């Protein structure tokens, strides 16, 4: 999980080239109650971070490249450097990576985290809805992403949640990414604006009209948009199967 192929460059956990928010603003505290902060102990024993989001009381959705030896999820957080009264810290019982995940091509970059216990749903901890399996977001639509990643190539990761509004791009805008697949991925962020997810933001959501349509996956190692997000609608049947224990 080192060097997100930003992925290895852009969206891995912060130490691995993961993404953060560039060109955004600090989110209003607890305005995104589905957001999850992932503290990851890698297979090598180092510490990384990713984002994720709560889709059921006992399940967090994130990117497969955020896998690790051990993961602790913090829900209800705004400033992850503090022990806020709203926070719920829950260890991950099981990491469920899509069986077709390909780290070389950055495809099927999706993972479900089953928590050791159900989260208590509160005004600051809540789930976010997913799209239907046939729901595609059209190019030109404006959506949001959020995370605790870096705010610049040479900047540290953010301790407070940040957010940025991004434009959904036509697939041609991501043609520089050799293995980009429109059916399974979303091209996000105009190349004319320095706004994107960046290192440390990996696994966070792409939010369109209150629905999670994407997962931060990878992009340019220097944080230049567009970036690639996993298209959630393509995986809705798999997600439902895992959550329902089938």
Swiss-Prot record:
Organism: Mus musculus
Role description: Has a chymotrypsin-like activity.
EC number: 3.4.21.-
Lineage summary: Eukaryota, Metazoa, Chordata, Craniata, Vertebrata
Disulphide bonds in the chain: 50-66, 143-208, 174-187
Active-site residue numbers: 65 (charge relay system), 109 (charge relay system), 202 (charge relay system)
Tissue: Mucosal mast cells.
Name this polypeptide is given: Mast cell protease 1
Keywords recorded for this protein, A-Z: Disulfide bond, Glycoprotein, Hydrolase, Protease, Secreted, Serine protease, Signal, Zymogen
């Amino acid at each position: 999980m080192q060097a997100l192929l930003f992925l290895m460059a852009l969206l891995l956990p912060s130490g691995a080239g993961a993404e953060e928010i560039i060109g955004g603003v600090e989110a209003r505290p607890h305005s995104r109650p589905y957001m999850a902060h992932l503290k990851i102990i890698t297979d090598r024993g180092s510490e990384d971070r990713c984002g994720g989001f709560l889709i059921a009381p006992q399940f967090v959705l994130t990117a497969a490249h955020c896998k690790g030896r051990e993961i602790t999820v913090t829900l209800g957080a705004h400033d992850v450097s503090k022990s806020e009264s709203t926070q719920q810290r829950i260890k991950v019982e099981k990491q469920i990576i899509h069986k077709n995940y390909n780290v070389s091509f950055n495809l099927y970059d999706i993972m479900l985290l089953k928590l050791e216990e159900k989260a208590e749903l509160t005004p600051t901890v809540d789930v976010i809805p997913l799209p239907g399996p046939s729901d595609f977001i059209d190019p030109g639509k404006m959506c949001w992403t959020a995370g605790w990643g870096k705010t610049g190539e040479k900047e540290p990761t953010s301790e407070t949640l940040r957010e940025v509004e991004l434009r959904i791009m036509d697939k041609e805008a991501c043609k520089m990414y050799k293995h980009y697949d429109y059916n399974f991925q979303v091209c996000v962020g105009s190349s004319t604006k320095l706004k994107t997810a960046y290192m440390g933001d990996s696994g966070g959501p792409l939010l369109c009209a209150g629905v999670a349509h994407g997962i931060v996956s990878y992009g340019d190692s220097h944080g230049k948009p567009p970036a690639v997000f996993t298209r959630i609608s393509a995986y809705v049947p798999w997600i439902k199967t895992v959550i329902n224990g089938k």
